[in-house]
Swiss-Prot record:
Misc: The gene is not located within a recognizable secondary metabolic gene cluster.
Keywords, ordered alphabetically: Prenyltransferase, Transferase
GO molecular function: prenyltransferase activity
Sequence similarity: Belongs to the aromatic prenyltransferase family.
Enzyme Commission designation: 2.5.1.-
The protein's name in its UniProt record: Aromatic prenyltransferase
SUPFAM superfamilies recorded: Prenyltransferase-like
Function: Prenyltransferase that attaches isoprenoid moieties to carbon atoms of aromatic substrates in an enzyme-catalyzed Friedel-Crafts reaction. Shows specificity for dimethylallyl diphosphate (DMAPP) and does not accept geranyl diphosphate (GPP) or isopentenyl diphosphate (IPP). Prenylates the artificial substrate 2,7-dihydroxynaphthalene (2,7-DHN), as well as dihydrophenazine-1-carboxylic acid at a lower level.
pH dependence: Optimum pH is 8.7.
Gene name per UniProt: ptf
Length: 336
């Protein structure tokens, strides 16, 4: 189902109201001071791009957001100029190295936290890239490179995204894994972060229900200083209608937001509201709108779910409402 919708211009004051109301609805921490610094530092990107929101079913977890624009930016320089981190930060040097691997193809963008402000820079590499390129880039520490054999033995050879989280001093590598997620394969992948944990058949069945049998995205989060694997994640992309994960009470809390605000739960600052929402989607509170002063294609029923595993928290699938997990993904196109 495709709709053409003319979108409103980004309004920072409206955004501040929306983010505070959403944090209040889900019980997420919020700092207006940090949020203002983000909006000031990336003013042009927020004006050009869609604003995507991310929440999880973990009580007290953060509300994250990002801008999504189809142009290449120097996110590192923007963050330094805005004094969001110091020049020559080790993680920023790593991001620059990864970006330089594929000139003209790699694209940088950022993730932000409603409480912490600036949190992460990630790089879309433009295509599937060999793991050897990623690990051999300048500024990749030996403690990270030492995992190469383990990754290859698990069939983790192709990388599409990388990221660096400045709040946790970690890096993420996002692999494309070919084929079906079997019980043994899932257990092998999860053991990277928690060797003692044994996935149950039912847990894998729930993930497999959402995963494309052709393949899936698998992420590894490592401490930049020590190389320790802190977390792994299995992502289900392009969810078909009717196959969405169950939403717990925290996620359903967004229903308390007035109807005209509900479109902001995933993407912000649009005019796909009220009757347009009701006409386009069966459940208005699980919809999204996009901030672009131009037309957009709305593809209903495309989304992302993720299952995170880390030894420091109870191991359980996590519903991750990110980049349209529930209903839609938006592709911006220029108006004629």
């Amino acid at each position: 189902m495709i709709q053409q919708v003319q979108q409103a211009v980004f309004d920072p004051e409206r955004f501040l109201v929306d983010i505070e109301e959403t944090c209040r609805a889900i019980g997420a921490p919020y700092s207006q001071e940090k949020t203002l610094k983000v909006l000031e530092g990336f003013q042009a990107s927020f004006a050009r791009g869609a604003v995507l929101w991310r929440i999880t079913n973990r009580p007290g977890d953060a509300l994250n957001y990002r801008f999504y624009e189809r142009v290449s930016i120097d996110a590192v320089s923007c963050a330094v100029e805005a004094k969001l981190f110091q020049p020559n930060h080790p993680l920023s040097e790593l991001i620059v190295s990864w970006t330089a691997l594929y000139p003209g193809a790699a694209q940088q963008s950022c993730d932000f936290d409603a409480e912490q402000g600036f949190s992460k820079i990630w790089v879309y590499l433009g295509d599937m890239r060999p793991l050897s390129d990623i690990l051999s880039a300048p500024h990749v520490p030996l403690s990270i490179r030492k995992h190469a054999t383990t990754f290859y033995n698990l069939g983790l050879e192709l990388v599409r995204h990388v990221a660096a989280d400045f709040t946790s001093n970690t890096i993420n590598i996002y692999f494309r894994v070919q084929g079906l997620l079997t019980l043994e394969r899932a257990r092998s992948l999860v053991r990277l972060s928690d060797p003692a944990y044994l996935l149950e058949c039912g847990e894998v069945e729930e993930m497999r229900r959402l995963l494309n049998p052709v393949g899936f995205t698998f992420a590894v989060t490592m401490d930049y200083s020590t190389g320790d694997i802190k977390r792994v994640g299995i992502y289900a992309l392009k969810l078909a209608p009717g196959t969405y994960p169950a939403m717990d009470e925290r996620l359903k809390a967004t229903r308390a937001i007035p109807l005209e605000k509900q479109a902001y739960i995933l993407l912000s600052q649009g005019v796909l509201m009220a009757k347009e929402v009701a006409a386009a989607f069966p459940v208005p509170s699980e919809t999204a709108a996009v901030n672009r002063p131009r037309e957009v294609d709305v593809e209903v029923g495309v989304g992302v779910a993720s299952f995170m595993f880390q030894p420091t928290t109870p191991i359980a699938p996590t519903v991750d409402v990110r980049d349209n997990v529930v209903v839609a993904v938006f592709h911006a196109v220029e108006s004629p």
